[in-house]
Amino acid sequence: MKIITQILPLLIIGFTIILILLSIAWQRNHFMHASLTVVGLLLAIFSLFFVVHGSIANFTTLIHVDSFSIFYTGLVLIASLATSTLSYTWLSNNKDYKPDEFYILLLISTMGGILLTCAHHLTALFLGIELMSLPLLGMVGYTYRKKKVLEACIKYTIISSVASSFLLFGIALVYAVTGQLSFIGISNYALNEINYPLMLLAGLGMMIVGISFKLSLVPFHLWTPDIYQGAPTPVSTYLATVSKIAIFASLMRLFFYAPFNTHYEVKLLLCIIAICSMFIGNLMALSQNNLFRILGYSSTAHFGYLLVSWLVIQNVLVLETVGLYLFGYLLANLGVFGVISIMSNVSKKDTDLIGYYRGLFWYQPMLSVVMTVMMLSLAGIPMTLGFIGKFYIITLGINNNLKLLTILLLISTMISMLYYLRIVVSLYLYPAEKLHTNTYIQYNWALTSRGIMVLISSLLVLLLGLYPQPLINIVQWAQIINPR
């Protein structure tokens, strides 16, 4: 019974998928299936409270449930809930496509994300990535009659296949050397070996390449802005949050067990990727006028910052730092994509250009304030949650003598402020003449489910930025428990 309790979120999501499948066979009803999805995700979130009171459990050798996996499962479920909230209106506006199957794809992908957060074995890691990525192909290309959507789907299919190939070949090489696939078995080998064989280094390198594709790290990031721009807004939201947070959490556990970061070649590779991601991501974003492309390059920079944590992952402050940063990143992205979704709905077209938001404050002051808060949080401005996360990363770098990397991180952050503040300034400029007749002026967005989600996100970003102690307590609790 205790073991069943530990995997309760997975069971609830699985039951919801079966229920929606049977319901579709009986009758198609978009509202009912959207409601079932939301209810299933809410129940899965509430079930985490029962999981918290249970003991640490190994359901199989593949899955390990502890406070760390519970925390990141919560992040995955919250992001999936936000995605389903944004999806309802988008699917309702695209009446040429049957909407019901989208929710099945979303829930299956969410199961893959949950599996990743609990992964304790390279097999579970690979299965989780594939279970999350394959439904995403259908989600990206759901409105396939649109040229840019079809283009994004084809690109994502190719990139996902290449990334999986690198990852799988890397796993095979690691297994060939260590004879182990479990994180603990690999950890035992890594702790007992001083000089790693060339084949093991090659395997680790290929795994890092595969993961870098998934996390949009330089030089494997070029697909990101194209996919963000081409995919529907709710799917871009999911790509920016769930698909990256779940993979990063799983790799955090692997590197926490097996100290590969102490090896010179691995550390050098991670340093190069981190520095290139921070600078190239931010520099490329400077020249963009499309919000989706800016957010795509921005995500590359943010995960470049987070790579600093992998270099010193055995430090006691690392898990707390990453938890704070990713929670702030999640809320800010949900808020920004939520605002874009609200604007797109009323105009019945994509509002992804910065110029479209010029003077928004003069017609929708609350919406512009929400957008401002999210941009300031992404930039790491004080009094927002994003500042707390960035402060922790800088502290982590200084405390571990990564002074050069920390200085480069600060310079990169200052570069990022240029494009974040450019968006903020445009919100308060006097609007162009064509915006005087725009339909969104009278649109009461705050009473919609998306509006409520956006308001809650912005409120949390501000409150936790001013008083982060409740979140700090949670991330201090969400530690990896070594079962050895």
From Swiss-Prot:
Protein name in UniProt: NADH-quinone oxidoreductase subunit N
Catalysis performed (reactions): a quinone + NADH + 5 H(+)(in) = a quinol + NAD(+) + 4 H(+)(out)
UniProt family annotation: Belongs to the complex I subunit 2 family.
GO cellular component: plasma membrane
GO molecular function: NADH dehydrogenase (ubiquinone) activity; NADH:ubiquinone reductase (non-electrogenic) activity; quinone binding
Recorded superkingdom: Bacteria
InterPro entries found in the cross-reference section: NADH-Q_OxRdtase_suN/2, ND/Mrp_TM
Biological function: NDH-1 shuttles electrons from NADH, via FMN and iron-sulfur (Fe-S) centers, to quinones in the respiratory chain. The immediate electron acceptor for the enzyme in this species is believed to be ubiquinone. Couples the redox reaction to proton translocation (for every two electrons transferred, four hydrogen ions are translocated across the cytoplasmic membrane), and thus conserves the redox energy in a proton gradient.
Keyword Zinc: no
Record membrane topology: Multi-pass membrane protein
Pfam families noted in UniProt: Proton_antipo_M
HAMAP family: NDH1_NuoN_1
GO biological process: ATP synthesis coupled electron transport
Subcellular location(s) per record: Cell membrane
EC number of the protein: 7.1.1.-
SUBUNIT field: NDH-1 is composed of 14 different subunits. Subunits NuoA, H, J, K, L, M, N constitute the membrane sector of the complex.
Keywords from the named record: Cell membrane, Membrane, NAD, Quinone, Translocase, Transmembrane, Transmembrane helix, Transport, Ubiquinone
Transmembrane stretches, start-end: 6-26, 36-56, 62-82, 99-119, 122-142, 166-186, 198-218, 238-258, 266-286, 299-319, 322-342, 369-389, 405-425, 452-472
Enzyme's top EC category: translocase
